[in-house]
Amino acid sequence: MKKNIHPEYKKIFATCSCGYTIPIFSTKSSDMSLDVCSQCHPFYTGKQRTMNKKGRIQRFKKRFNFSEI
C-alpha cells in the first residue's frame, strides 16, 4: 500500500432525530444527522405493528365476487 494517499479517519458524532448520539469514525469531517437508529426504530424497540391482511383479502373477494374454490 502506498503511504499518505488514504483519507484521514476522524471521530465524528451521528445524532438521531430521537436525540441519541453515536460516535463513529469516518472520512467525513462534520457531524451527521440520522432519521432513525436502533434506539427508536420499531423493529429494534419491539413496537412494530403487523397488518391485518385477512380483512383486506375479504374486501377484495367481496368487491370482485370471488367465492371459495
From Swiss-Prot:
Domain of life of the native organism: Bacteria
Record's keyword terms, sorted: Metal-binding, Ribonucleoprotein, Ribosomal protein, RNA-binding, rRNA-binding, Zinc
GO cellular component terms listed in the entry, alphabetical order: ribonucleoprotein complex; ribosome
Listed InterPro entries: Ribosomal_bL28/bL31-like_sf, Ribosomal_bL31, Ribosomal_bL31_A, Ribosomal_bL31_sf
Co-factor note (free text): Binds 1 zinc ion per subunit.
UniProt GO MF annotations: metal ion binding; rRNA binding; structural constituent of ribosome
Annotated Zn(2+) binding sites: C16, C18, C37, C40
HAMAP family in alphabetical order: Ribosomal_bL31_1 (MF_00501)
Biological role stated in the UniProt entry: Binds the 23S rRNA.
Record note on quaternary structure: Part of the 50S ribosomal subunit.
Family membership noted in the UniProt record: Belongs to the bacterial ribosomal protein bL31 family. Type A subfamily.
Entry protein name: Large ribosomal subunit protein bL31
Organism this protein belongs to: Buchnera aphidicola subsp. Cinara cedri (strain Cc)
